[in-house]
């Protein structure tokens, strides 16, 4: 009986969660709204947040500070790590604890005022994030999650067993902030609520600056495909470390607020379950979505407290008794269970969250899991609000050219060097556990050439590219770019040295637009720092404008300028290949490595690709090409090298290679012996 009664409740609830179309349409309209409309809406929302608490009783004012306000601050910080950079952190409560304990020690032991301890609490938490991230961020997925979980428990256990930190007794007598503008900070919740609100507003301002900059694009690229991001010049380790540091600093801010308000902390305030709650807020709201995370944190903090309220509990009790025919007397003791059950239902029927980011919605749609969204992506990623919305026409080439002072669309960002030899491999050998993938390979590529590398599958062609780009470090030998050795450099450093590549299997950032993909490439040539992005320095704003203009030019150059606002995953296969080439060119290379660019193309697409490759070469860019299509190779290459079983068996002009008996036997195929019996 109870089972069938619950079905009566949850069937309509499931339909509601699947069809949150007004929320999704509103998110799309918000993404396309002009700046002044967004400003008015945010101003009205801020006024609402300021005025409404004045009408509430003290209990609900206290709830708005903790848990709601603290949860929102912490969820915004964790969203940087989990939602934007794609790093799973299960020990986030540690940074909250570090901020709280720093405040407690400075105000009780060293006599600091609460305001004076604020920057130190944030800084120490940030340092803790760096100390955790530096040795662990080369781990990925579950391994990183396990390490962060352990860190969270270590911080709590250290606090519990350290006498100077109060051990299990905790620390009492933490100072409240001194009065400002006549406002006293004692135990009354309202001043602390407004303090938390101010922290949220300032944090949102800084966060939006980051997400609309190179930093935000780098985080999005890392989440989409970390290896491809590194190949496009993104310093992935540094950017992940910045994400950890920013998230930790936000957690430290939350710890300062909490300790300053309650005046007493102990290790029991920072259990592992608290990290789970904040992570649940991020997932519930929509990973990567700032408004979604705020909504999720509000729900996580407010609803259990609402269920605790006697009047609300009586209402829900009456509803449950009516539906199930049971006799529930005290609903408050089941509030966590009911809320947990509601979260499970939410995650089943709307896994993208309340207000999902565009990336999250697209990922779930691609996996066939997204039952709650229309085909059109819901919201534009905050990192590129200025980019065309998906499916919308891009800015015209003429308008962009005018913005860039009339620079020519055909100009490529080619790195100009005096050296005649662009790329040189000197006796490169690559072994994997005794298996020789490359054996003493030497190749010299002259400036302005289209140099082809051919050979049967397994000959070592892609391994050679991986050695050049820093994915693998050769067992022996050397790799020189423009006369300088790049051996041992990380892939993004080799990109900076002038090497760009495409991949055998297309590796775009599928849930970013075509324009955003190429802008990630242009970022490799810009030097804007994270502090510069936070402060919105003139250089940063100029580079942002120039990067978008140049990205649109390159899309026009490869023939897909009209698709700039489309998600990369929605482009036809041939256009995806062109986009990958445009993104690689955007890094400003002196040599472009193309790994089987014609694979999967039809004859007309291949013919267009031949024209594009020649056009790129004529613009001054050297090309090294791996390809199995002999018609394409013989038609565009100036010189060829042939690999077989990891060794170079021939090198020379295409005609000589075509007639080389050893190449014919190993790869091209010998003519059939008609005289055989």
Per-region residue spans from a language model:
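Compositionally biased, intrinsically disordered low-complexity regions
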Residues: 172-175, 184, 342, 355, ...
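Glycine-rich phosphate-binding loops of nucleotide-dependent enzymes
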Residues: 414-677
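ABC-family P-loop ATPase nucleotide-binding domain
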Residues: 359-429, 672-677
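Residue-level detector of alpha-helix boundaries and kinks
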Residues: 32, 50, 139, 268, ...
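Generic N-terminal initiation segments characterized by hydrophobic and/or small/turn-forming residues
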Residues: 1-3, 61, 162, 168, ...
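Transmembrane alpha-helices and adjacent helix-loop boundaries
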Residues: 1-394
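Short linear motifs at secondary-structure transitions and domain/linker junctions
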Residues: 17, 21, 28-30, 38-40, ...
């Amino acid at each position: 009986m109870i089972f069938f009664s619950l079905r009566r409740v949850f069937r309509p609830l499931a339909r509601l969660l699947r069809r949150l179309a007004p929320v999704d349409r509103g998110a799309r309209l918000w993404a396309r709204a002009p700046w002044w409309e967004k400003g008015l809406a945010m101003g009205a929302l801020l006024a609402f947040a300021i005025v409404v608490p004045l009408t509430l009783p003290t209990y609900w004012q206290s709830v708005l500070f903790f848990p709601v306000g603290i949860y929102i601050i912490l969820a915004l910080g964790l969203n940087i790590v989990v939602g934007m950079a794609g790093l799973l952190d299960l020990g986030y409560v540690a940074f909250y604890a570090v901020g709280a304990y720093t405040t407690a020690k400075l105000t009780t032991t060293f006599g600091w005022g609460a305001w004076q301890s604020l920057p130190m609490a944030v800084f120490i938490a940030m340092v803790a994030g760096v100390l955790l991230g530096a040795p662990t961020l080369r781990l990925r997925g579950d391994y990183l999650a396990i390490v962060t979980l352990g860190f969270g428990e270590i911080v709590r256990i250290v606090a519990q067993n350290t006498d100077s930190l109060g051990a299990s007794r905790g620390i009492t007598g933490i100072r409240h902030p001194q009065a400002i503008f006549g406002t006293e900070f004692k135990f009354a919740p309202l001043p602390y609520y407004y303090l938390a609100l101010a922290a949220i507003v300032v944090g949102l301002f800084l966060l939006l600056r980051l997400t609309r900059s190179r930093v935000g694009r780098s985080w999005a690229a890392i989440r989409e495909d970390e290896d491809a991001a590194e190949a496009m010049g993104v310093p992935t380790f540094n950017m992940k470390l910045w994400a950890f540091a920013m998230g930790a600093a936000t957690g430290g801010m939350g710890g300062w607020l909490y300790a300053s308000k309650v005046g007493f902390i102990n290790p029991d305030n920072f259990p592992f379950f608290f990290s789970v709650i904040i992570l649940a807020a991020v997932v519930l709201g929509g990973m990567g979505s700032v408004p979604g995370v705020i909504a999720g944190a509000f729900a996580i903090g407010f609803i259990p407290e609402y269920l605790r309220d006697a009047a609300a509990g009586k209402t829900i009790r009456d509803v449950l008794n009516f539906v199930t025919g049971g006799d529930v007397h005290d609903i408050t003791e089941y509030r966590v269970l009911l809320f947990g059950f509601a979260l499970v239902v939410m995650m089943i029927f709307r896994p993208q969250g309340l207000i999902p980011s565009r990336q999250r919605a697209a990922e779930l749609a691609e996996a066939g899991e997204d039952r709650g969204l229309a085909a059109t992506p819901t919201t534009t990623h905050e990192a590129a609000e200025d980019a065309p919305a998906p499916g919308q026409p891009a800015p015209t080439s003429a308008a962009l050219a005018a913005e860039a002072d009339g620079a020519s669309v055909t100009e490529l960002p080619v790195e100009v060097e005096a050296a005649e030899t662009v790329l040189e491999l000197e006796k490169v050998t690559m072994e994997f556990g005794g298996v020789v993938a490359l054996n003493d390979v030497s190749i010299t590529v002259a400036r302005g050439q289209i140099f082809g590398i051919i050979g049967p599958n397994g000959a070592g062609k892609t391994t050679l590219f991986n050695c050049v780009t820093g994915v693998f470090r050769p067992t022996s030998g050397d790799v020189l770019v423009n006369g300088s050795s790049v051996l041992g450099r990380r892939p993004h450093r080799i990109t900076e040295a002038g090497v760009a590549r495409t991949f055998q299997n297309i590796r775009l950032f599928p849930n970013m637009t075509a324009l955003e993909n190429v802008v990630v490439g242009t970022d490799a040539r810009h030097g804007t720092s994270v502090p510069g992005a936070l402060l919105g320095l003139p250089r940063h704003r100029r580079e942002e404008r120039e990067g978008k203009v140049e990205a649109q030019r390159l899309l026009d150059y490869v023939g897909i300028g009209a698709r700039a606002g489309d998600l990369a995953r929605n482009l036809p296969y041939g256009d995806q290949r062109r986009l990958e080439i445009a993104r690689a060119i955007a890094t400003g290379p002196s040599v472009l490595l193309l790994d089987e660019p014609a694979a999967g193309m039809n004859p007309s697409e291949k013919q267009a690709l031949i024209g594009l490759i020649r056009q790129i070469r004529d613009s001054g860019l050297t090309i090294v090409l791996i390809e199995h299509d002999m018609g394409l190779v013989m038609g565009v290459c100036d010189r060829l090298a042939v690999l077989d079983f990891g060794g170079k068996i021939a090198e020379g002009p295409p005609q000589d290679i075509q007639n080389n008996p050893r190449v014919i036997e190993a790869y091209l195929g010998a003519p059939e012996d008609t005289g055989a019996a």
